[in-house]
Regions:
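Short consensus segments that form the blades of beta-propeller domains
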Residues: 85-89, 116-123, 162-165
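Sec-dependent N-terminal signal peptides of Gram-positive bacterial secreted proteins and lipoproteins
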Residues: 3-26
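Acidic/hydrophobic-patterned starts of short beta strands in beta-sheet-rich repeat architectures
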Residues: 102-114, 156-161
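Beta-propeller blade termini
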Residues: 92-101, 147-158
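Blade-edge motifs of beta-propeller repeat domains
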Residues: 32-90, 135-149
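Surface-exposed loop/turn elements that mediate protein-protein interactions on large endomembrane-trafficking
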Residues: 127-143, 173-186
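Acidic, small-residue rich beta-repeat scaffolds with periodic aromatic anchors
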Residues: 22-65, 161-261
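Structural motif
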Residues: 118-129, 167-173
Length: 261
């Protein structure tokens, strides 16, 4: 009888011990506050939130013509796309991405033209507009339109090709500075002279003959150089504008932060 009583008491004490253990463990869990931590991890950086407003305004403009929120600067090439392409084609061919081309660790917003699809990726060399994030807000950097081209080189220099006619063609090589301004590397341009066209160069990126030096380059050599820059420009992986509403920037996977820096 005593042995049965002792056994019953021992089992009861064991159950109490296990019950207490479970209570202590459960009491710790609410202090971890996992839902709040997960929510914090999902908050996008300020630049993504502001860039999203720009891309959303482009989407709305292409989709239904609403231009109320479309930035004044950087819209020219985008407006041309809407004029010559049908709605669905424009939403498919216009792309957006984030890529750090200034080297400051904060990416720029690039909007451009998708020229091909490989696998699940969408690629193109042409950029229509670039925006950066400086002093807590979006800042316009550059844009192009018909008869001009803006492309990115492997060293993150930006190359603009264009002109106002046969006698005035331009090739500008610039780099984006951390403050959001473009710095000039060099500018080549053609200009009429007595015996035809001359090729001029300066480092101010202003096509002013008097502030430039005439080179010994022929127009043919100048055009070859323009073509070489175009051929050596890099492909950019874009996300199609049509997918912006459902995925935003999430599929970029922070690939825009330059791995080599």
């Amino acid at each position: 009888m005593k042995r049965k009583l002792f056994k019953s008491m021992w089992l009861a004490m064991l159950l109490v011990a296990f019950a207490g253990y479970g209570t202590e463990q459960n009491a710790v869990l609410p202090q971890m506050d996992l839902p709040k931590a997960e929510a914090a991890a999902k908050v996008a950086p300020a630049y993504e939130q502001e860039y999203a407003k720009v891309v959303d305004s482009v989407y709305e403009f292409i989709a239904d013509g609403t231009s109320d929120n479309l930035p004044e600067q950087g819209r020219t090439g985008i407006c041309e796309v809407r004029d010559f392409a049908k709605r669905e084609a424009a939403l498919q061919q216009l792309g957006y991405t984030l890529q750090d081309i200034s080297g400051d660790g904060v990416p720029e917003l690039l909007i451009g033209w998708i020229s091909q699809k490989r696998g699940v990726g969408h690629y193109g060399k042409e950029i229509y507009a670039i925006y950066t994030f400086a002093n807590g807000s979006v800042k316009y950097v550059a844009e192009v339109w018909s008869r001009s081209s803006l492309q990115l080189m492997a060293n993150d220099n930006l190359v603009t090709r264009g002109g106002t006619g046969i006698s005035h063609q331009v090739l500008a090589v610039e780099h984006l500075q951390p403050d959001g301004d473009l710095g000039c590397y060099e500018l080549y341009f053609t200009w009429p002279k007595d015996d035809g066209l001359g090729v001029y160069r300066n480092m101010s990126c202003r096509s002013e003959k008097d502030a430039s030096q005439e080179t010994d380059m022929t127009v043919e050599e100048f055009n070859e150089m323009r073509s070489e820059y175009a051929n050596n420009s890099v492909e950019i992986e874009y996300l199609p504008l049509k997918d912006f509403k459902k995925q935003g920037f999430k599929d970029l996977m922070r690939q825009y932060l330059s791995a080599g820096r």
